[in-house]
Amino acid sequence: MYLVIIFLPLLGSIISGFFGRKIGVQGAQLITSSFIIITTMLAIFNFFEVGYNNIPLEINLFRWIDSESINILWGFYFDSLTVSMLIPVLIVSSLVHIYSIGYMSHDPHNQRFFSYLSLFTFMMIILVTANNYLLMFLGVEGVGVCSYLLVNFWFTRIAANQSSISAFLTNRVGDCFLTIGMFIIIWSFGNLDYSTVFSLAPYFNQEFITLIGICLLIGAMAKSSQIGLHVWLPQAMEGPTPVSALIHAATMVTAGVYLLMRSSPLIEYSSTVLILCLWLGAITTIFSSIIGLFQQDIKKVIAYSTMSQLGMMVIAIGLSSYNLALFHLVNHAFYKALLFLGAGAVIHSVSDNQDFRKYGGLKPFLPLAYSIMLIASLSLVAIPFMSGFYSKDFILESAYGQFYISSTLVYFIATIGAMFTTLYSVKVLYLTFLTNPNGPLNNYKNVDQGNIFINLPLIILAIFSIFFGYLTKDVFIGLGTSFFIDNRYFIHPSHEIMLDTEFALPTLFKLLPLFFTITLSIIGIMFSEFFGNLLIKFKFTNLGYNIFSLFNQRFLIEFFYNNYITNFVLKLGGQTTKVLYKGSVELLGPYGLEKRLLNLSKNIGSLSTGVITSYALYILIGLIFYVFLLYLNIDNNILLLLLFGIFSTINKK
């Protein structure tokens, strides 16, 4: 049953990709979707069997690498962390498959699309279930390649080509550091198996652990779109909307967070890595929230919202609250997938226009889309009793409950980020559904409310976004829970803060995020309704224009990368390639070797002058040299060097 969970999506991908012409569009949709649904049902069963009953399971298929002390198996490990990650990955993937049947119904390449979706899901399952870093790295590379294929699905569009290449190359930076971290692990621990590495970690030097942790953190930064390696995330919106929901809700962007959670027995011994995670997540949260407030593309706003929530998860990891990071990851997967698919329903209904300034007044035309986006937004801003409330607010409380200066500052920074999250959520809802119509008349005449394949996944995800957090909060973050008793997480005793967060936090700081959320929601709607002209007038002033340009252009980070880093690297690479090519081909390679042999033969040939005295001189020199060889013990290499020097000297003369 466990191997069926892993390999059934791969089988669906192969059938749809290689035999798509034989089975047709409906056959590809039916086979891939049914295989993913079966896999999801088995994963839910395993969630109860492995997670609730605390019965971890390891499956070793065959020996992959056997070289002296390095022994790496192709094996899979199912524990509470694995089955918890499989739940959002497979539920969202199955709903995206169903949604895509309706959303991509007019696309001529359905077989290829569903093959890519299933292959993406398979690679994510490999990443999550691997029992060693090398197999997990295979999954990381696999989801990177599949994301390139999916973002570039409409490969005739130049923007899709550029975005997919940007995403691929940005992730290669993180993968490079992840590879370096794996090399250090092999060199220091002698293996890449989780159990071996985590068992030996307490006995190693902290500098080694810090170096490995930083490499793993940079690898996670690329996959989970943390500041510095975040530029690919909004550009990946060029792919179809179901792809955006799959990549940015439950799969690729969570891979980096999962890597850090899985490596908790390693990074817990390095306070440097934990403090880096704490501040990296805080800066990412407020940075992405500010940028999201000034975007006009509905999918890009949701993408920056994803980046902000990933920053929250990294904050939780920096606080050593790994179960809290996992709980927020699972909750976030459901309501963020709901946001993306709801945005896709709106885009699908208004002639594929993504600028929400050209929407307005869609509430009477799309009541279901309005309802589900309202539910998802309420969960995103952590309104009480929605799923996001039980995890997001607890992360903020944990930051304040650690009672260190860094964590206290991070609490206020993340709270400000949550305030901006509220503002852009209200902005999207207001400009899309509530304000006066701003789009072409044809968009409203031809509004399509979607079919059962589009609406059913939205309803299911809305139910998860409302109830999942409440139903599972005691399982994931309850003080008496035994869900993680199999020790998949390791928290150093000096980093344990759950009790302080639960009992020592002032009520004011528990209610502060909720107060800001409600207040800013009211202020945002009132300001847009009654004082909108003031904002427009300020925007046309020099100060307002400069502020808006800075935030709308994403703090000019892409401009800096393109003009100062990318160009420099390209020039340096060009010069290096030129020098190495000249050195390897013209001096040492085939051309250089041929040239040197020809020169040597000419030097030897020039000794034949036709003059008797010259030949007599050669004979005399050779005789003297031979006599000396009888009495001197000279290495043969030195003799060859002397002969080469003599021939070179003669040639110069």
Swiss-Prot record:
UniProt KW keywords: Electron transport, Membrane, Mitochondrion, Mitochondrion inner membrane, NAD, Respiratory chain, Translocase, Transmembrane, Transmembrane helix, Transport, Ubiquinone
Compartments reported by the entry: Mitochondrion inner membrane
Coiled coil: none
Residue ranges of the TM segments: 1-21, 30-50, 81-103, 120-140, 177-197, 200-220, 241-261, 274-294, 301-319, 331-351, 365-385, 403-423, 452-472, 511-531, 610-630, 631-651
Pfam families found in the cross-reference section: Proton_antipo_M, Proton_antipo_N
GO cellular component terms listed in the entry, alphabetical order: mitochondrial inner membrane
GO BP, sorted A to Z: ATP synthesis coupled electron transport; electron transport coupled proton transport
Gene Ontology MF term list: NADH dehydrogenase (ubiquinone) activity
Principal cellular location given in the protein's record: mitochondrion
UniProt xrefs under InterPro entries: NADHpl_OxRdtase_5_subgr, ND/Mrp_TM, NU5C-like, Proton_antipo_N
Catalytic activity: a ubiquinone + NADH + 5 H(+)(in) = a ubiquinol + NAD(+) + 4 H(+)(out)
Membrane topology (UniProt): Multi-pass membrane protein
Enzyme Commission identifier(s): 7.1.1.2
Xref: PANTHER family: NADH-UBIQUINONE OXIDOREDUCTASE CHAIN 5
Summary of the function given for this chain in its UniProt record: Core subunit of the mitochondrial membrane respiratory chain NADH dehydrogenase (Complex I) that is believed to belong to the minimal assembly required for catalysis. Complex I functions in the transfer of electrons from NADH to the respiratory chain. The immediate electron acceptor for the enzyme is believed to be ubiquinone.
Name this protein carries in UniProt: NADH-ubiquinone oxidoreductase chain 5
Organism: Trichophyton rubrum (Athlete's foot fungus)
